[in-house]
């Protein structure tokens, strides 16, 4: 039986070896590149695979159609996932006739999700285990094939329990894999009523609350002991980490967080005292408790505290889905420039946000909104403001993939809106200037202009009507269920990181990127229907400032409002945009590295976009709502925007590529 394996960590190594020992043919292994910021104390699946002579890959997005096609060419009979960190798309799961199976580090249906090893210790469980289950679209929700229980001893910490689970996993796989190889794969459904879900743990989750019971604090120490980041507290501004501890039942009447004694080092909790056996001050070395007390300058009666607060208010948590996109990455930068915002983000890639990945107030998970529904629901509940920015928003895709546009832009986003309703969270939703369609007004008014689209046989309008329908649903939820919302409608925002030249090469980019690609490659600039269509181009900096003010929502003035964000003064036809771009290109210092200008070429829209396309003559916003609600006025001239956008793309072109 031929297998394709997705694996990482020690469990991944155990799984690969067990599959080989059971006599399977492994066609390929998919793993992850190690993160330099992570403590990689565990075994390397890639080194194991290379040593065994098995092809091994570590794609950024294994769910990309290119990788799906490559896996299909391998023709696997069965798929295994052993601690692979990303969910697999349904397209991949359906490639193996015998099914796809995941090894999870808990006794399902309990502790679905991330970091079950740590969570069972945090919660003081006495038993856990490993489960092999069928993979379905929802994480850890498929039918159970086999499981093995593991007792948790009182002196177990994260690393010792990790070793126990690896041993149990190997035993489980050794017993079940030969049976599965013969085609006998019995499974039983999980009981949904018993399901629990836990999210990813972060280093900052190790902060100790001394007002908790001593058993809770001790369990936290066990759960994140080395090589995990550790449980920590503060003496003044000095951070220290506790690596091992024991419970003392008597707090001697001391207040929580008070140092009872320094030799041994004991700290009062809500109902007892924690004895600190070993610990570490700052980035120093690990020492025993009494030496730690001496290093920190602790005396009996001292009070430990939480980290020094930058302000009395909790930071506002903003959830951005599609955080790696054009708007998402620029908005993240604006929010992180303010001390009182924390950003949680998801996207299928991280190239545009790589500059934020180590920022302490930026929390990113690579994932797909159509797959990671439980993560999304958890973070909608956790955050204060939600921005669902994921959408297919390039015209050629409207005619090429109308059903996919509807599924993503409407159906997936509707689910997120319903989470916002359920947990009573404020949503800032990206409508679009496209909802106005072929409106005949000189400028489009959010509250008065008619929304006019073409006939059903023009799939070009699928994006417009998907967004419009969601606008109406959100409005109805506001009226009937009290949903707090603001709809914003961007008008042709431009700037650095708009999209990519590779996207332009397959026709799936914004207009200016396509024009820049023509200049870079020395191909004619294509003017669709002569390029007479007029748009109002808005600098990303102006747009993001307006969006930031919507999030701030001073005096709640944005609640229940629809706000156009565009620059009426920057109106130009596509032909005028192309001419301005060409002028800037000819003056650019890198101009000599690129081919000669190949001229303009007039192209009929039907031949470029397909028969389902229909264009709009003009699109100009009224920005009265933005002025009134935000005190906002765009200020950046179109030429400045064009020059900055062009400069970004030209400098992104590889030197060798320029020369060719």
Curated annotation (Swiss-Prot):
Keywords: Antibiotic resistance, Lipid A biosynthesis, Lipid biosynthesis, Lipid metabolism, Lipopolysaccharide biosynthesis, Multifunctional enzyme, NAD, Oxidoreductase, Transferase. One of its GO terms (molecular function) is UDP-glucuronate dehydrogenase activity. The record marks 102 as: Transition state stabilizer. Pathway: Nucleotide-sugar biosynthesis; UDP-4-deoxy-4-formamido-beta-L-arabinose biosynthesis; UDP-4-deoxy-4-formamido-beta-L-arabinose from UDP-alpha-D-glucuronate: step 1/3; Nucleotide-sugar biosynthesis; UDP-4-deoxy-4-formamido-beta-L-arabinose biosynthesis; UDP-4-deoxy-4-formamido-beta-L-arabinose from UDP-alpha-D-glucuronate: step 3/3; Bacterial outer membrane biogenesis; lipopolysaccharide biosynthesis. Residues 314-660 are annotated as: Dehydrogenase ArnADH. NAD(+) binds at residues 347, 368-369. The record marks 140 as: Raises pKa of active site His. The keyword Oxidoreductase applies. It comes from the Bacteria. One of its GO terms (biological process) is lipid A biosynthetic process. (6R)-10-formyltetrahydrofolate binds at residues 114, 136-140. InterPro entries: Arna-like_SDR_e, Bifun_polymyxin_resist_ArnA, Epimerase_deHydtase, Formyl_trans_C, Formyl_transf_N, Formyl_transf_N_sf, Formyl_transferase-like_C_sf, Lipid_A_modif_metabolic_enz. PANTHER family: BIFUNCTIONAL POLYMYXIN RESISTANCE PROTEIN ARNA (PTHR43245), UDP-D-APIOSE_UDP-D-XYLOSE SYNTHASE 2 (PTHR43245:SF13). Homohexamer, formed by a dimer of trimers. Bifunctional enzyme that catalyzes the oxidative decarboxylation of UDP-glucuronic acid (UDP-GlcUA) to UDP-4-keto-arabinose (UDP-Ara4O) and the addition of a formyl group to UDP-4-amino-4-deoxy-L-arabinose (UDP-L-Ara4N) to form UDP-L-4-formamido-arabinose (UDP-L-Ara4FN). The modified arabinose is attached to lipid A and is required for resistance to polymyxin and cationic antimicrobial peptides. This is Bifunctional polymyxin resistance protein ArnA. It comes from Salmonella heidelberg (strain SL476). The lineage of its organism: Bacteria, Pseudomonadati, Pseudomonadota, Gammaproteobacteria, Enterobacterales.
């Amino acid at each position: 039986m031929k297998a394709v394996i997705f694996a990482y960590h020690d469990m991944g190594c155990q799984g690969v070896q067990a599959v080989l020992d059971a006599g399977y043919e492994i066609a390929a292994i998919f793993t992850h590149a190690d993160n330099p910021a992570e403590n990689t104390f565990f075994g390397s699946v890639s080194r194991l695979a290379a040593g065994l002579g098995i092809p091994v890959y570590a794609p950024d997005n294994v769910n990309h159609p290119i990788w799906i096609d490559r896996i299909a060419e391998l023709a696997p009979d069965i798929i295994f996932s052993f601690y692979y960190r990303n969910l697999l798309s349904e397209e991949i799961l359906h490639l193996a006739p015998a099914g796809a199976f995941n090894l999870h580090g808990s006794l399902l249906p309990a502790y679905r999700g991330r970091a079950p090893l740590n969570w069972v210790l945090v919660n003081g469980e006495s038993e856990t285990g490993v489960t092999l289950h069928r993979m379905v679209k929802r994480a850890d929700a498929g039918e159970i094939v086999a499981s093995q229980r593991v007792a948790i001893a009182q002196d177990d910490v994260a690393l010792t329990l990790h070793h126990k689970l690896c041993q149990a996993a190997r035993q489980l796989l050794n017993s079940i894999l030969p049976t599965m190889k013969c085609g006998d794969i019995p499974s039983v459904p999980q009981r949904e009523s018993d399901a629990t879900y836990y999210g990813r743990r972060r280093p900052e989750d190790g902060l100790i609350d001394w007002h908790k019971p001593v058993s809770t604090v001790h369990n936290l120490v066990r759960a994140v002991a080395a090589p995990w980041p550790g449980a920590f507290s503060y003496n003044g501004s000095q951070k220290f980490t506790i690596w091992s501890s024991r419970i003392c039942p008597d707090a001697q009447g001391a207040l929580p967080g008070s140092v009872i004694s320094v030799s041994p080092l004991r700290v009062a909790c809500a109902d007892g005292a924690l004895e600190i056996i070993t610990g570490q001050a700052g980035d120093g070395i690990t020492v025993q408790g009494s030496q730690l007390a001496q290093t920190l300058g602790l005396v009996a009666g001292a009070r430990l505290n939480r980290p020094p607060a930058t302000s009395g208010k909790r930071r506002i948590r903003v959830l951005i889905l599609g955080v790696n996109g054009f708007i998402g990455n620029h908005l993240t930068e604006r929010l992180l420039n303010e001390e009182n915002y924390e950003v949680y983000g998801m996207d299928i890639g991280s190239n545009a946000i790589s500059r934020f990945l180590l920022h302490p107030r930026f929390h990113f998970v690579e994932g797909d909104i159509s797959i990671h529904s439980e993560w999304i629901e958890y973070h909608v509940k956790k955050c204060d403001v939600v921005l669902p920015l994921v959408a297919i928003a390039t015209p050629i895709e409207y005619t090429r993939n109308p059903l996919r546009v509807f599924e993503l832009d409407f159906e997936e986003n509707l689910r997120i809106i319903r989470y916002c309703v359920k947990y009573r969270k404020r949503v800032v939703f990206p409508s679009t200037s496209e909802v106005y369609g072929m409106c005949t007004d000189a400028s489009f008014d959010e509250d008065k202009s008619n929304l006019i689209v073409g006939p059903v046989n023009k799939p070009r309008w699928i994006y417009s009507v998907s967004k419009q329908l969601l606008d109406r649903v959100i409005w109805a939820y506001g009226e009937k269920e009290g949903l707090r919302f603001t709809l914003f409608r961007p008008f042709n925002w431009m700037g650095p990181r708009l999209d990519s030249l590779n996207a332009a090469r397959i026709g799936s980019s914004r207009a200016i990127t396509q024009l820049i690609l023509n200049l870079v490659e020395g191909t004619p600039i294509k003017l669709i229907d002569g390029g007479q269509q007029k748009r109002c181009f808005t600098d990303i900096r102006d747009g993001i400032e307006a969006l930031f003010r919507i999030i701030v929502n001073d005096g709640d003035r944005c609640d229940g409002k629809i706000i156009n964000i565009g620059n009426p003064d920057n109106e130009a036809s596509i032909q005028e945009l192309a001419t301005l771009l060409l002028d800037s290109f000819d003056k650019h210092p890198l101009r000599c590295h690129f081919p000669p200008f190949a001229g303009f070429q007039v192209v009929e829209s039907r031949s470029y976009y397909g028969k389902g396309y229909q264009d709009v003559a003009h699109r100009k916003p009224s920005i009265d709502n933005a002025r009134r609600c935000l005190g906002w006025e765009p200020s950046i001239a179109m030429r400045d925007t064009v020059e900055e956008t062009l400069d970004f793309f030209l400098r992104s072109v590889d030197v060798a590529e320029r020369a060719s």
